[in-house]
Amino acid sequence: MKAAQLHGLWAVRFSKPPAGLPARAMMLLERHAEFSESLAGIVSRDLGAAEGSKAIAGHASKALLAGDLDEGLLLLDESSDKVSITGTWNGEMVEGSCGKVFQGTWKDTSRSAPDNAPDVPFTLTKLP
């Protein structure tokens, strides 16, 4: 599978997201502007009343993504401030999904994350 096959809109569902972050999000993946075999994109979350709160201080409703698809592993870094990595995504293609479903874990690495921030399971599903 090539990174280009992941270009498009994805629905994100988190299992047990941390306080203040929603259980659902949208992700747009595209070709990276500098590295044609890599991915870039945006993850969009509705932070609602939690936006700007201490619990999610390190996150924005829209965060930039950059990463790679490496031998079936999806590896993305997330940045809410365009400077530091505020989250990491590590996922694998679900067998039999033809590259349309990935499951893995998201990790909060923002300044507001606790030292022992848990890995948060996610499922990405490609939208038509």
Regions from the PLM with identified roles:
Residues M1-P128:
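Central antiparallel beta-sheet cores of small beta-barrel/beta-sandwich binding domains
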